Amino acid sequence: ALGVRRLHAVIGGSFGGMRTAEWVAGFPDRVERALVVASSGCATADQIAWGHTQVVAITSDPEFRDGDYLRHGTFPTNGLALARQIAHASYRSASEFEARFGAEPQPGEDPLEGGRFSVEGYLDHHGAKLARRFDPLAYVRLTQAMATHDIGRGRGGLVAVLEAYEGELLVAAVDSDRLFPVSASTRMMRAYGRGRLRMIHSPYGHDGFLIEADQIASLVHELVQRPLRGTPRLVRGVA
């Protein structure tokens, strides 16, 4: 309806990076350029495992009611908060947690007397925060979508998909990411067979793609300014 036939660039990080990879696989003739950040071409066993524990946390909450909680007037707050805590632990790096929290107690609490460690208070905060604003079933479905992500399924595999892509593909990984490790991005670049993996340097783990704005901006600028393969370069001063 909009008459858009080709996209100058498709850019995404994390789950958005999965969607970007799917655009490349599903519409290779329409996507001129793509930037996949802190993501992958297919889910790994480790990602599926992290997601599974989150789904179980939600669906095991008695207030989930097999997903029919709205009709029953209930809400699986505890399950959703726990799922977020599990997820948030995977979003940050072990080194950041150690440097930021160590084994320090939560202010005003004593872990030896039933109180919390500081890192536990941090996770509790983020769990409660998400539970106030997110739908549990939507969380489950998004997590399941990530687990089943595989752009090579039904298309001859990851290598076949990316080797056939004629556009420009940039793939970037966060060097401290334990949810979408560097190896997942490396696999994509090897399948594409051209260029090199870009590295985002950050102590913040997977969330580095949200925090390191200057590095992301540099990647976006590189992508949108890059001429397509086969496109003549304009050289200043040459007629």
Q: What do the PLM-derived regions correspond to, one by one?
A:
Residues 30-32, 36-129:
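Alpha/beta-hydrolase-fold enzymes
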Residues 165, 171-173, 177:
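Short beta-strand/loop motif that positions the catalytic acidic residue
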Residues 125-126, 141-161:
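Active-site nucleophile elbow and catalytic-triad environment of alpha/beta-hydrolase enzymes
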Residues 9-11, 23, 34, 171:
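Conserved alpha/beta-hydrolase fold motif
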Residues 1-9, 18, 28:
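Conserved acidic catalytic loop of the alpha/beta-hydrolase fold
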Residues 186-190, 194-239:
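Catalytic active-site module of serine/aspartate enzymes centered on a nucleophile-bearing elbow/loop
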Residues 17-28, 34:
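Short glycine-enriched nucleophile-adjacent loop
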Residues 154, 178-184:
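Conserved alpha/beta-hydrolase "acid-adjacent" motif
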